[in-house]
Amino acid sequence: MDIKFGFADTARELVISAAGDQAELTQKINSALADNSTLELEDDNGRKYLVRTDRVVYVEVGIAKKHAVGFAGA
């Protein structure tokens, strides 16, 4: 599952690939945003991310899409 965060006053985004159910992750993110608390997430490689939710402008949660590589179908 890919989670993309957009922050105020910057054009950069934070993208985290995390294992888990979309509904479960969305509920966890919604709770942190509502409480204006720090959100803790872990990616597929075991790295932990702490996100301050007071500067989050948007969050996109979706299934990671595999991109085709090579000339197949060209």
What is each model feature region?
Residues 23-30, 34-48:
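Amphipathic, hydrophobic secondary-structure cores in small proteins
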Residues 49-74:
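C-terminal structural segments of small proteins and small subunits
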Residues 1-3, 37:
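Short structural boundary motif marking the start of a folded domain
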Residues 3-12, 67-74:
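Short, surface-exposed polybasic-and-hydrophobic patches located at secondary-structure transitions
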Residues 12-14, 49:
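Short beta-strand segments
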Residues 5-7, 17, 25-26:
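Basic, polyanion-interacting recognition surfaces, primarily
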